[in-house]
Amino acid sequence: MSPKTLYDKVFEDHIVYEDESGSNLLYIDRHLVHEVTSPQAFEGLKNAGRTVRRTDCTLATVDHNIPTISRVNFKTLLTFIDQDDSRLQVQTLEQNVKDFDVTYFGMTDDRQGIVHVVGPEQGFTLPGTTVVCGDSHTSTHGAFGALAFGIGTSEVEHVLATQTTIQANPKNMRITIDGELSEGITSKDLVLHVIGVIGTAGGTGCVIEFAGKAIEDLSMEARMSICNMAIEAGARAGMIKPDEKTFEYIKGRPLAPKGDEWEKALKYWKTLHTDDGAKLHYDIKIAASDIVPTITWGNSPQDALPITASVPDPANVSDPIKKSGMERALKYQGLTPNTPFVVIKMHKAFIGSCTNSRIEDLRAAAKVAKGHKKADNVKLVLVVPGSGLIKKQAEKEGLDKIFESAGFTWREAGCSMCLGMNPDILDPEERCASTSNRNFEGRQGARSRTHLMSPAMAAAAAIKGHFTDIREFDYVDNDEPSITIEHEVEDKELQDAVYEHEKEIIEGTPGTEAERSTTSLKMNQNSKKPNQMLIKMVPITVLPFLTGITAPLYKANVDTDAIIPKQFLKTIKRTGLKNGLFYESRFVKMPMVRCQTDFVLNVEPYRQAEILLVTGDNFGCGSSREHAPWALKDFGIKSIIAPSFGDIFYNNSFKNFLLPIRIPQDVIESKLVPVVKAGHKLTIDLPNQQIKDGETGDVLIEKFDVEEFRKHCLVNGLDDIGLTLQKEEYIQEYEAKRREKFSFLEGGSKLIKPIKGTKKSIYGNKAQEW
C-alpha cells in the first residue's frame, strides 16, 4: 500500500462513489447547523417533501444572531431578541429542528454556544470524521484529525437530504513549525504569522496539515485556534494529526464512544497520521523562533506583522494592485505609514469568537486583566465565552470577577462582535483589538476598524489603551495557579461541567455497538423512503452559452463581506439581495439619503453586466455565506472570471448556476482586459470551454478549466440532490459498511441525555425547548 497523508486517509475512508471525472460523493459523519445558513436549506427540504436523512449525525444551536446580554430575565425569544430579522431567523430554526427532529441547544440550555465550540465540547467532533457546517470556520474541527470544512446553504440542504456532499479532491499542503515557541507566543500569533507568510490565497485548493514540535506542544484548544484560521489562508480545511492529547480531551465526553467502542475507535484513530514518503504538493517549513506577538494592520488577515513593527508604507511597493490595496486599507483604517504599532490607540476590545472564546483563552486574558483597570480611552471591553458551559466554568474559577473588576463586560455565549450581525457592533471608525478571525471592511460594524491578535494581547491593549507587546506587560502578580492550569489538566474542570448532564444513565439509550447499529438502521429506514420517491430531476437553469456586457473589477482579495455585508444575511429567503451587492462600494450613506458612487456596477453600460472580470486573486475569499452568489445572481451576473477564487465561494457559485472561471492574471490583463476596455462584450462557450470576443468572434481563451461533472450540471441544468439520490444504493452500501467498520460513530447527537422535563426515547432526547 502506497504511503498516504492524514487527509488522504480520512478522505478515502468516506468515499461513497467516484465518477469518471474524478468527482467524489463523500459521506458526512457530523453536520452542525445554525440559524443563519439553514433556513433556506430546510425550506428546500419542505418544498421537495424530503426529510433529514441522519438526524443522529446532525446537531443544531443558535449563535450568530443572538444578543449576548444577560439571560437572567429571559422569558421568550419574542421579548428577548429586539431585532425582527434576527428573531425571525432564530424562530425559524426552532421550528425547523422541531419539524425535522434535529437535536438542538437553545438559549435556555447551558450547552448552547458557538457551533465550533459546542461540537468538540460535547464529543460530537471525533478524529477521522468528516464534519461540515454552513460556516467557513468549520475548519476548527480539523484540530482533532477530522476533515472539516464549511459549506454553503445549498450544500447544507444536500447534506441534510443525502448525508453526502460532492467534492473534488484538494491538494496536500503541509506546514511544519520547527522548534519551540518563545515565552508569551500563542497559537494566534503562530497562525497569523503563517497567514502573513503564505497569504490569504496561499492555501487555495489545498488541505493544510499543521505539523512540527511547536504544533505538538500546543493544547487542544490552541490547536483549534490554528485550524480555525486555516480558511483565512485560503485552505479548504486545516488538520492536525490526533495524539494522546486529543484522545485525553475526547475521552468521556457526552457523545464520545464508550467501553469497547472507545477501544475500537482508539485503534483506528492511532492510524491517522501522514506516512513517510506520502505525496505532498507543497511542504512549507517555518521556524518557531521567527514567531513573535503578531497583530494585523489592514483589512485582510494576511496584513499581519510583529507588534514591534510599524505600519507599512505603500511607497515601498511596486505592484500596482497591491499598492492600491494597501492605500485603500490604510485610508479605511485611519493609519499613517511608518507609525509604530505600539503607539496606536484603540476604543474597544473584543475577547471571544470561535477562534478564541474557550476556557484557556479566558484564563489568559484574565491573567493580564487581574489587578488592572481598563484605560480611560477604552470605551468597552467585551468578554464573550464560547458556550454556556464555558461561562459557568469561568465563573466557578472567578474569572468573571477579575474581568468585571478591570472594567471589562462579561457576557453570555454567542458569536457577538466577531461579525456584528447582533447588537454587539462597533460605531463607525472605532478601533478594536479583537481576538476574532477576520478584519474585513465593515466586519464588526459599518466603517469599523479591526485589528486581530491573541486574547492576552487584546486584554493588554485594553489595559494600556494602545497596542502593546505582551512580553513587556507588567503583570500585577504571578499568582498563576488560581487562574491558570497546566495543559495536562486544563480541561478537567470544564469536563466536569459538561458531564453534569451525563451523570445519570439513560435507560434505553443505545450504547453498545449492536444497539447503536439498530438505532441507526431504524433512522435510515425511516428517512430513506420519502427521499427515494423524490429523485426526479427538474432542469433549473441552463448555461451553455453566454454573451454579455462585462464589468471589469481591478481588485484583489474581494471578500464575501465586501460582496454582501452581514446586515443582508438576516433573511430566510434566497432572493431580493441585489441591493446589498457590493453595498459599501456602491453606496455612500449620507444623512437621510443613500448616494451612489462611481463603482463599476453603478456606471453604464455595466448596470446591465452579466459577466464580472476580476483582475486580482482570491475573489470570494472569506465566509461560507451563499448570500454572495445569490446577490450576484439577483443583480444579473451569470459568470465571474478571475485568477483564483475562495474555495467555498467557488463551490457555492456552481450550486447556483453561476459560472466561476479561473484564468491566470497575466492572461486576463493581456487578452481579456483590452477587449473589455474597447467596449466589447465577452462570449463564454461552456461546452467548448472557450472565451471569445463577443463582437468579432475571435477566440481569446482556447480552453479554460472546469470540472466535467460541474460542466455537465450547468449545461443540462441538473439538481445535485436529485443526481445524488439516484445513487441511493451506493449510499446504503456505504452506511452498511460504516455501521460495521465505524460503529463508534453511530448514534451521534441522539445519544445526548434529555434535560429535565423532556421526553425520553431510545434515541436520547428530542429536539428541545418547545
UniProtKB/Swiss-Prot annotation:
GO biological process, one term: L-leucine biosynthetic process
Record's GO cellular component terms: 3-isopropylmalate dehydratase complex
Pfam families tied to this protein: Aconitase (PF00330), Aconitase_C (PF00694)
InterPro entries: 3-IsopropMal_deHydase_lsu, 3-IsopropMal_deHydase_ssu, 3-IsopropMal_deHydtase_ssu/lsu, Acnase/IPM_dHydase_lsu_aba_1/3, Acoase/IPM_deHydtase_lsu_aba, Aconitase/3IPM_dehydase_swvl, Aconitase_4Fe-4S_BS, Aconitase_4Fe-4S_dom
Enzyme class: lyase
Gene Ontology MF term list: 3-isopropylmalate dehydratase activity; 4 iron, 4 sulfur cluster binding; metal ion binding
UniProt EC number: 4.2.1.33
UniProtKB keywords: 4Fe-4S, Amino-acid biosynthesis, Branched-chain amino acid biosynthesis, Iron, Iron-sulfur, Leucine biosynthesis, Lyase, Metal-binding
Cofactor(s) the protein needs: [4Fe-4S] cluster
Binding-site list for [4Fe-4S] cluster: 354, 415, 418
Pathway: Amino-acid biosynthesis; L-leucine biosynthesis; L-leucine from 3-methyl-2-oxobutanoate: step 2/4
Keyword Iron: yes
Reaction catalyzed: (2R,3S)-3-isopropylmalate = (2S)-2-isopropylmalate
Comment on bound cofactor: Binds 1 [4Fe-4S] cluster per subunit.
Oligomeric and partner information: Monomer.
Function: Catalyzes the isomerization between 2-isopropylmalate and 3-isopropylmalate, via the formation of 2-isopropylmaleate.
HAMAP family, alphabetized: LeuC_type1, LeuD_type1
Family per record: Belongs to the aconitase/IPM isomerase family.
Protein name (Swiss-Prot/TrEMBL): 3-isopropylmalate dehydratase
Organism: Candida maltosa (Yeast)
Taxonomic lineage of the native organism: Eukaryota, Fungi, Dikarya, Ascomycota, Saccharomycotina
